[in-house]
Design a protein with these regions (language model features):
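N-terminal segment of the mature soluble domain
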Residues: 49-56, 61-110, 117
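Bacterial N-terminal signal peptides
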Residues: 17-27
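Conserved Rossmann-like nucleotide-binding pocket used by diverse enzymes
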Residues: 25, 53, 125
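Short, flexible beta-strand-to-coil junctions
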Residues: 59-63, 128-133
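Conserved acidic residues
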Residues: 122
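N-terminal post-signal-peptidase region of extra-cytosolic proteins
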Residues: 39, 106-114, 126
Length: 186
C-alpha cells in the first residue's frame, strides 16, 4: 500500500491534499439549525385558533432592526404555511396607535382579551431575538390564546453560516422554524 502511494505524482498528491482540506473546511460552513418546539395539542385543538396577530419581536441587540426583521420573516413564513390567517402588520399598528399602545408591548397595557377584541384575532404571536449575526442567529416565538392566556405552542430556533449574508441566514433560520412547527402540529 505504501509503495502504491509513493508512485503517485507529487502534483497529484498536492491536489488530493488540497481537495481534502477544502472539503473539510467547507463542511463547517453549511447551515446548522437547532429547533426546539413545545405545544399543548389538546389545548390547541380546544382553542381552535384561526387568525393571529404577529407582534414585533423583542431584541436587546444594538441592531434595533433585529426584532422587526425576524418578526416580519416569521409572519411571512407563517402566512405562507397556511396554518393561520394573519392580520396585516399595518392594521395592527393602526389599531394600537389609535389606542395609544406601543406596537411592541413587552407587557401590553391591554389584556390579551382586549387585544383579541380590538384586532379580531384568536391568538397573538410574541417573540424575542437572542442572537443576530450570520454566524449565530437565534429567536423564540410563542402563540398565546387571547381567550385563555395560555401559551399554545413555542418554537426556538438557532442557525448560522460562515459564508452567507445575514439576510440569507435569517430567512433560512425562520423558514426552518416554521417548517418544523408545521410538521409537529399536523
Amino acid at each position: 500500500m505504501l509503495a502504491d502511494f509513493r508512485r503517485i505524482p507529487k502534483q497529484l498528491k498536492s491536489l488530493l491534499a488540497f481537495a481534502g482540506l477544502t472539503i473539510f473546511a467547507l463542511s463547517g460552513c453549511t447551515a446548522k439549525f437547532v429547533t426546539h418546539t413545545s405545544f399543548d395539542r389538546p389545548q390547541l385543538q380546544q382553542e381552535n385558533i384561526q387568525k393571529v396577530a404577529v407582534f414585533l419581536f423583542e431584541s436587546t441587540y444594538i441592531d434595533m432592526q433585529a426584532g422587526s426583521h425576524i418578526s416580519r420573516l416569521f409572519e411571512l413564513n407563517l402566512q405562507q404555511s397556511g396554518m393561520y390567517k394573519i392580520v396585516e402588520r399595518a392594521e395592527i399598528e393602526k389599531v394600537l396607535r389609535e389606542r395609544g399602545v406601543p406596537p411592541s408591548p413587552a407587557e401590553p397595557p391591554l389584556s390579551l382579551r382586549q387585544l383579541g377584541d380590538l384586532l379580531k384575532v384568536d391568538g397573538v404571536v410574541f417573540g424575542s431575538v437572542s442572537q443576530y449575526n450570520r454566524f449565530n442567529l437565534g429567536f423564540t416565538a410563542r402563540l398565546v390564546s387571547v381567550k385563555s392566556g395560555l401559551v399554545l405552542w413555542s418554537v426556538s430556533q438557532t442557525g448560522g453560516r460562515y459564508f452567507a449574508p445575514l439576510s440569507q441566514v435569517a430567512d433560512e433560520t425562520v423558514k426552518e422554524a416554521v417548517l418544523e412547527l408545521q410538521t409537529k402540529l399536523r
